[in-house]
C-alpha cells in the first residue's frame, strides 16, 4: 500500500547513507538514530505539542504552504524543490475599475468610470479570490490616456514599452509614486465576495478591526517592474507575500476551493 511504498523509499538508501556520512568524517549515532516515520517519534512530538498546549503556548492561525491536490495534503519545501523546474507559463493582464481616488492624489477623474488599474498575474485561477492590489511604494507610475479606447490606465512607467510599441498611441497625464495610491478603491472583478468591500462585514467575519475593507490598493517592497505592469493582484489565501500584505488588515481570507483544489459553490460560475 501507499505507506509501505513510502517506508521502502526511506529505507532504500539507509546503508549507502551510513557509508557516505562516515567517509565524510561526520559523526552520527546510527545505532541509536530515529526516523520521523516511527510511531515512537510521532508520539514524542505529540507529547511536546500537548505540553505546549497545556502551557497556553499554542494558538490557531493560518499560513501559506505548498499543497498537493492529488494527495490532498500540504508539502514540505523539500518535497516541492524535488520537482522544481523553470517553465514558460501563461500570464494575463487584467484591468480593475477605480471607484474611489486615494487621499494623496487630487484627481476626481479617477472616479469617472473609465480609469483602471492594470494588474498582471501568472495565476489567473486565483482572480475570483482577489481582495486587493499592490504597488511598489517607490516605483514611478503613470496615468495614461489610451487614444484608441478613450480609457485611462494606471501602471508602472517602466512597463509602458511592453504594452505600447508606438508612443503615439497614448498620452501621459501625470506621474506619481506607488505610495500615493494607497487606499484607492476599485470595483471587484466578480460578485462572489463583493460584500467584503464593507468594513463592517469584514469585522463580522474576521472578528478583527477593519477600517477600510477589501478591494483597495496596498503597497509592498516585493513588487517589481521586471515583469507585468508593476501592479500585482492579491489573493491572501494563495500566496505568502499576499498573505503578509493583508495580515492585520481585518479583511478575512477567502478560500473557495475544496481539498482537490476545485471551486466550491461560493464561485458559482465555475463550480
Where are the predicted features?
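Short acidic beta-strand-loop surface patches of small beta-rich interaction domains
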Residues: 261-270
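Gly-rich Lys/Arg/Thr-decorated short loops/hinges at beta-loop-alpha junctions or inter-strand turns
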Residues: 1, 225-227, 265
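Alpha-helix capping and helix-coil boundary motifs
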Residues: 1-5, 177, 271
Amino acid at each position: 500500500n501507499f505507506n509501505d511504498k513510502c517506508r521502502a523509499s526511506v529505507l532504500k538508501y539507509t546503508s549507502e547513507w551510513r557509508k557516505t556520512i562516515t567517509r565524510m568524517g561526520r559523526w552520527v549515532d546510527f545505532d541509536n538514530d530515529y526516523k520521523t516515520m516511527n510511531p515512537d517519534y510521532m508520539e514524542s512530538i505529540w507529547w511536546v505539542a500537548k505540553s505546549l498546549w497545556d502551557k497556553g503556548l499554542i494558538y490557531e492561525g493560518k499560513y501559506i504552504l505548498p499543497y498537493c491536490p492529488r494527495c490532498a495534503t500540504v508539502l514540505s519545501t523539500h518535497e516541492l524543490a524535488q520537482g522544481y523546474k523553470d517553465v514558460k507559463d501563461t500570464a494575463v493582464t487584467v484591468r480593475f475599475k477605480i471607484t474611489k481616488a486615494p487621499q494623496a492624489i487630487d484627481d476626481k477623474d479617477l472616479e469617472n468610470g473609465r480609469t483602471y488599474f492594470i494588474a498582471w498575474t501568472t495565476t489567473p485561477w486565483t482572480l475570483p479570490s482577489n481582495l486587493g492590489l499592490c504597488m511598489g511604494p517607490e516605483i514611478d507610475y503613470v496615468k495614461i490616456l489610451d487614444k484608441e479606447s478613450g480609457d485611462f490606465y494606471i501602471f508602472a512607467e517602466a512597463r509602458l514599452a511592453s504594452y505600447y510599441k508606438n508612443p503615439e498611441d497614448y498620452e501621459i497625464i501625470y506621474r506619481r509614486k506607488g505610495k500615493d495610491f494607497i487606499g484607492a478603491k476599485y470595483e471587484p472583478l466578480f460578485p462572489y465576495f463583493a460584500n467584503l468591500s464593507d468594513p463592517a462585514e469584514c469585522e463580522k467575519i474576521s472578528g478583527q478591526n477593519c477600517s477600510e475593507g477589501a478591494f483597495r490598493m496596498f503597497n509592498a517592497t516585493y513588487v517589481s517592474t521586471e515583469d507585468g505592469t508593476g501592479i500585482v493582484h492579491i489573493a491572501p489565501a494563495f500566496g505568502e507575500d499576499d498573505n503578509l500584505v493583508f495580515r492585520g488588515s481585518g479583511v478575512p481570507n477567502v478560500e473557495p476551493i475544496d481539498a482537490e483544489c476545485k471551486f466550491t459553490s461560493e464561485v458559482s460560475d465555475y463550480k
